[in-house]
Amino acid sequence: MKKLSLLLLSFASAQINYSGEINPSVMTRKSDQSQINLPFRIASLEGGYTFGSVDLKTSIAIEHRWNTGESVFNLREVYLAYYPDWGEVKFGKQIHAWGAVDGNNPTDNLNPYDYYYMFSPGTKRKLGTISFSSKIYVGNFQLEGIIIPKHEINRMPYGEKDFPLSMP
C-alpha cells in the first residue's frame, strides 16, 4: 500500500500540458463560390506529460470532408523523450524539422509531405514516421543522429478533381 501511495504521489507531481484548436472551415473558389471538397483538419490537440527528465508527447488531428461527412482520426505524433545531462533521446512517431527558413527548406527532408496541406506552414505539412533520434551536446556544439527504419512515402492527392494543382 505504501508503494502504491508513493507511486501515485510521484505521478501527481508530474506536469501535464495540452493545447488544441477547432477549425471548422470551408474552402471555396473565388470564380464561382463553389465549394472545394478536400480534406482539412477540423480539430487538433497536442498533449504532453512530463515526469522529471522524461516526456510523453502527442499530437492528434481529426481530418474531415464536408462532401461525405467523413471524419478520420490521425495520430500525427506520439513519442517518448528522455533528457539526460549530455543531450536528448527520442523514440516513437515523430515529425523532424531541420532548420528554419521562410519557404521550402532543402535540408528538411526526413519526413514525407502531406500534399493536401502543402500550403500550410512548417510541420503541419509533414507526416510523422516511426524513428529514433538523439542529440549529444559537447561544449558549444551538438551532434544529432536520426534512424528511420521504414521509409514512408508522401501522401499525394491522386484522383482529386478539386485539388488546385495537377499531379504528375
Predicted regions: what is each one?
Residues K2-A12:
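Sec-dependent N-terminal signal peptides
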Residues M1-K2, V89:
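Generic cytosolic/nucleocytoplasmic N-terminal low-complexity/intrinsically disordered segments
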Residues R29-Q33, R65-T68:
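A generic structural signal for short coil/turn motifs at secondary-structure boundaries
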Residues I36-G47:
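Short catalytic helix/loop segments, enriched in acidic residues and glycine
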Residues G48-F163:
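Outer membrane beta-barrel
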Residues P164-P168:
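Conformationally flexible catalytic loops at phosphate/diphosphate-handling active centers
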